[in-house]
Amino acid sequence: MFRIVKWLIALPVGIFIFFNAYVYGNIITYRAVAPHRTAFMSMRMKQFEQEGRDVALDYRWVPYNRISVNLKKALIASEDARFAGHGGFDWGGIQNAIRRNRNSGKVKAGGSTISQQLAKNLFLNESRSYIRKGEEAAITAMMEAVTDKDRIFELYLNSIEWHYGVFGAEAASRYFYQIPAAKLSKQQAAKLTARVPAPLYYADHPKSKRLRNKTNIVLRRMGSAELPESDTD
């Protein structure tokens, strides 16, 4: 009986250690090499296949300096205003999310920073639980410890979902505006950013009033967005 209990404890611990060793190895690799495909991309494409949708993956990596500063500012203004200064976690946002989750009785709000969103996109699935949030936090901490802010942001910009099968700034820019990501205007960047929280909803509801309102909010906030110190755009 004791041996069974020991195995029941050792097995999940071993899986946790193995998975995090795998993740850490990939984080080190991604400091210099672009991901071939993220876990979220794979999950989403499998979902489309199961739903019978004929969707092809459109994912085009471009370096950080070939992405418009307008899009960088728009995303920081909308998704993580403290990105340049925090260590991966916005503690005020996390406390607010915990409060909202407690009031609703389930995990709905995440309080996720850009770094946390990237951790999820690269390695995790879409499930909402405190266990997954804990794993997301562990990955975020590892990533922030060994990766500079520009690279984290570069990975994020290239892995965001924007439409059915459309991932990353370059693919989105060409899909919506037929231009490279480097040439996005403020208005275009704000419109793209407004889609980020619910890209598939807005793909099906492109004339949503909520999308227009969010675009205007992003435009107003862009001027105060603080980019990482090493940004030279």
From Swiss-Prot:
Coiled coil: none annotated. SUPFAM superfamilies: Lysozyme-like (SSF53955). GO terms for biological process: cell wall organization; peptidoglycan biosynthetic process; regulation of cell shape. Keywords: Cell inner membrane, Cell membrane, Cell shape, Cell wall biogenesis/degradation, Glycosyltransferase, Membrane, Peptidoglycan synthesis, Transferase, Transmembrane, Transmembrane helix. One of its GO terms (cellular component) is plasma membrane. Its EC number is 2.4.99.28. It is found in: Cell inner membrane. InterPro entries: Glyco_trans_51, Lysozyme-like_dom_sf, PBP_transglycosylase, Pep_trsgly. It catalyses: [GlcNAc-(1->4)-Mur2Ac(oyl-L-Ala-gamma-D-Glu-L-Lys-D-Ala-D-Ala)](n)-di-trans,octa-cis-undecaprenyl diphosphate + beta-D-GlcNAc-(1->4)-Mur2Ac(oyl-L-Ala-gamma-D-Glu-L-Lys-D-Ala-D-Ala)-di-trans,octa-cis-undecaprenyl diphosphate = [GlcNAc-(1->4)-Mur2Ac(oyl-L-Ala-gamma-D-Glu-L-Lys-D-Ala-D-Ala)](n+1)-di-trans,octa-cis-undecaprenyl diphosphate + di-trans,octa-cis-undecaprenyl diphosphate + H(+). It is a single-pass membrane protein. The chain crosses the membrane at residues 8-28. Peptidoglycan polymerase that catalyzes glycan chain elongation from lipid-linked precursors. Belongs to the glycosyltransferase 51 family. This is Biosynthetic peptidoglycan transglycosylase. The gene is mtgA.
